């Protein structure tokens, strides 16, 4: 009824932007950092440039836009190359993403001031997040809209339960939704 907002209890958001971060991280793309982010543990990135790039997201690559900025500014890809990777992520084209991984790794290592072995180790962490993104990564605007809709559902569920459950049952997609909605209606 109110989307996947159970994780919000762990994060205790203070704004719609915090809600957006949680909503985006519970997608499959957040698998490798979800628990740390929900615990509000800032990610320790290997450079101040990456920290600055991801400062609004506790240091994590959360949105498609973060991935594009990372690919351009940290890995040296052009805007069109980064956008092609974003499209591959958006269309869940894992094969295209896999084909781009060597150039992302090489770009990261070339721009890193670290020795090659250290840079490769650092890059692999980000590559895992980008690979996870192929399962599904939200764009920032989509995440904000999703949160606002979820927030409104939660608001109506709490303050206007009759209207909420009526709307929920009228729009139920299957028998499980009807059964769950009816059980909730009896409970309230």
Language-model features, listed with the residues they occupy:
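Noncatalytic, beta-rich nucleic-acid-contacting surfaces in large DNA/RNA-processing enzymes
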Residues: 2-188
């Amino acid at each position: 009824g109110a989307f996947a907002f159970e994780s919000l209890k762990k994060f205790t958001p203070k704004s719609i932007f915090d809600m957006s971060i949680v909503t985006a991280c519970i997608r499959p793309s957040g698998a490798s950092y979800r628990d740390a982010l929900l615990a509000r543990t800032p990610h320790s990135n290997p450079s101040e440039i990456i920290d600055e790039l991801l400062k609004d997201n506790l240091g994590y690559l959360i949105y498609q836009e973060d991935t594009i900025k990372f690919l351009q500014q940290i890995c040296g890809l052009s805007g069109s190359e980064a956008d092609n990777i974003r499209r591959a992520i958006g269309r869940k084209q894992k094969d295209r993403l896999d084909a781009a991984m060597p150039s992302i790794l090489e770009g990261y290592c070339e721009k890193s001031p670290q020795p090659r072995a250290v840079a490769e180790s650092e890059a692999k962490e980000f590559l895992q997040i980008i690979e996870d993104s192929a399962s599904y990564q939200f764009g920032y605007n989509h995440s904000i809209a999703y949160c606002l809709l979820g927030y409104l559902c939660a608001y109506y569920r709490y303050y206007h339960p009759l209207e909420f459950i009526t709307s929920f049952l009228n729009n139920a997609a299957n028998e499980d939704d009807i059964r769950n909605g009816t059980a909730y209606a009896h409970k309230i």
